[in-house]
């Protein structure tokens, strides 16, 4: 798993009070599945990895990543959820800066 994906996974697991291992499991509850989808979204949108690259990081197909991103985007219409995702994005951007990773649309691989 790439460094950006690990950062996103750790941030989401911490924010949702879930063990990182739960996000790596093959299946799980809806809450765990959504946490994994959010981590995939942050890896794709925040770090700019392609859907295929994100899929490889999370051992999922690129179409699964596309579906995850669509679900998160749809929920961002809810102000509280959008605020939480924005806070995660900001936190990841600060961490990425400190670790010399690129965070943003242009991303780094």
Residue ranges of predicted features:
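Short Lys/Arg-enriched helix C-cap and helix-to-coil transition segments
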Residues: 76-95
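Short, amphipathic alpha-helical "recognition" segments used to contact nucleic acids or chromatin
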Residues: 33-49
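DNA major-groove recognition helix of helix-turn-helix
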Residues: 44, 69, 76
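Short, Lys/Arg-enriched anionic-surface-contact patches
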Residues: 10, 14-35
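Helix-turn-helix DNA-binding elements, focusing on the entry/boundary residues of the two helices
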Residues: 9, 50-51
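Short alpha-helical "recognition helix" segments of helix-turn-helix
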Residues: 52-58
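Helix-turn-helix DNA-binding helix
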Residues: 64-66
């Amino acid at each position: 798993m790439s460094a950006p994906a690990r950062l996103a996974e750790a941030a989401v697991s911490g924010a949702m009070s879930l063990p990182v291992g739960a996000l790596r499991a093959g299946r799980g509850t809806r809450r765990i599945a959504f946490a994994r989808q959010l981590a995939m979204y942050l890896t794709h949108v925040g770090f700019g990895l392609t859907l295929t690259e994100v899929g490889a990081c999370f051992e999922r197909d690129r179409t699964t990543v596309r579906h995850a991103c669509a679900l998160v985007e749809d929920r961002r219409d809810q102000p509280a959820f959008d605020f939480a995702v924005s806070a995660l994005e900001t936190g990841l951007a600060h961490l990425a800066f400190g670790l010399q990773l690129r965070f943003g649309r242009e991303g780094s691989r």
